[in-house]
Amino acid sequence: MKEFYENPLCVRYSGDAMKRVFSADNKFSTWRKLWIALAESEKELGLNITDEQIAELKEHQNDINYDVAKAREKEVRHDVMSHVYAYGVQCPKAKGIIHLGATSCYVGDNTDMIIMREGLQLVKKKLVNVIAELAKFADRYKALPTLAFTHFQPAQPTTVGKRATLWMMELVQDYEDICYVIDSLKLLGSKGTTGTQASFMELFDGDHAKIRKLDQMIADKMGFAGVYPVSGQTYSRKVDSRVLNVLAGIAMSAHKFTNDVRLLQHLKEVEEPFEKHQIGSSAMAYKRNPMRSERIASLADYVISDAMNPMLVASTQWFERTLDDSANKRISIPEGFLAVDGILDLYLNIVDGMVVYEKVIHKHLMAELPFMATENIMMDAVKEGGDRQELHEKIRQLSMEAGRNVKVNGLDNNLLDLIAADDTFHLTKEQLQQCMNPERYTGRSKEQVEDFLAEVINPILAKNKEDLGMTAEINV
C-alpha cells in the first residue's frame, strides 16, 4: 500500500548515487562535520575546547538521532537549533561548545555548497562518460555519408560521425562550464549573523588575524581552497543560479540530441535501443517509440524551467538576508540535480545501444544526390564546351521536372536520366554516374571528426580516465 505521494525523480529517474548526495544522512552528517571543523579550528586558535570534547563529537558524527531532532523542532520551530540540541544529547561533554560563535547559515550554507559540489562532480563524471560513448560512435561512423538537413530539408551531405561531433561539441561546452563552476565554488566560512564576524571578535578578543585564519582553517578541513571574502549572513544566491545554469545547459544539449534522434528514428535511419519485450503502444503493437529520447526531452524541459528558481530567489533577497530563499532552495536545487542525473543516465543508455541503419541512410541519400550533384555536372558539361548560364537554366528546369515526378507521381528521382537525354550537356549516363559517389560531397567530414577527437575529446577523456567505464541502468 502506497498512501502518500512519492517524487518521481527519486522513484523513476535519478540514480542511487545522486539520491545519496541529497539525502538527509549526507546533509546532517555534513552539518556535524562542520561543527567538528569549527570546534577543532577554535581549539587550535586558543579557545578552551578539549580533545575529549572533539573526540565525543567525532564519535557521533554519523549516527543522527532524527527522532530527538524532530521532536525538538516541533517545540522550537528551528531546524538548526533542533539538531544542535540533538547532537548535544549524544555529546553531553561537548554540548556547550557546539555551534560556538556560529549562526544557522554556518552549517546550512556551507553544507549546501559542499553538497552542490558533490552533485556537480557526479554530473561531471556521467557527462564525461556520455562524451566517451559519443566519441566511439563518431569514430565508427566518421566516413558514412548521410543527408544533412537544414530547415529539415535535404542539404549537402555530411557523415553520421560528423553529425555526432555536433552533439559532442555542445557537451564539451557543458564540460568546460561545469569544470569552471566546480573550481570556483568556495565556502561561506564563519561569518556570523550579518557577515561581519562580530561574534568571533568577542570570542577571540578582537584578534583579526585569528578570525581570518579561522575561515581558512575550516575551508581546509572541508576540502575547499577558500571562502568568499565578503558576504551577508548567507553566500550570494547568485551562486545557486550559476550552478543551476550549468545543469540547464546540459539539459539543453541533451534535448537537442533527442530532437535529432527522434527525427532520425522517424526516417528509420537511426534508432534508440528497443528491448526484446518492450511495448511501444497499448493499442498499436507494431510501434517502436523513442521513449528514452522523449523522456530526456521531458526532463530537460523541467530543468531548463527550474533554472529560473534561483534567479528569482537571488533577485528578491533583501540586504544581509531574508528567509524567502529557504523553501525554494530545498526543492529547486536537489530536483535540478536529480533530473539531470536521470537525463545523463538516459543519454548514456541511448548512445551505448544506438542502432544505425546504413542501407536506409544510403537509400535516402541516393534519392537526393542527383540534385546535389548538379553543380559538378554543370562543371563537367562546361568542360565539354557548354555554356554555364544555359546549363544552369536547363538544370533548373530538369530539376523541377524530376521533383514533380517524385512528389506528384511518386516515382524515383530520374534527374540523371533527364540530363543524359538532353543534348545540351553532351554527357553520357556513365559520365553522370561518376558524379554520384557520395564521398565526393561530404567535404572534410571524416577529417573533421578525426581532428576533433584527437584535439578536443581525447584530452578530456585522458584527464578523466579514472571516471570512465560507467554504464546506465534505466528503471523503467
Mark where each language-model region is.
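Short beta-alpha connecting loops at secondary-structure transitions
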Residues: 19-23, 68-70, 278-298, 320-335, ...
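Long, amphipathic alpha-helical stalk/connector segments used for oligomerization, subunit docking
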Residues: 302-388, 394
